[in-house]
């Protein structure tokens, strides 16, 4: 999972997927049985800041895959929104890990949130 906070990343991979990852766009690439990829900062005069998370699948020998989703509208509502899920949450990118939900948000000043109940919680 890649989530850009500031700047832009260009993604290319051996499956023919290519695109620009920008703030508010969540991207998932599953290596599966094998994939090559590159991610490059598009702006030479500006740093890019991003979060990248590896979530091991709960199934072996899956095919490589790629998905991206613009979540800006959900983030503007405040609170937390599911960015990626193996549990079928609406609007989330699908991941091959039934026990995982990755939440994110753009909190407003003084806004607080409650972490949703889950079998495993990492903050």
Label the predicted regions.
Residues 2-123:
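Jelly-roll (double-stranded beta-helix
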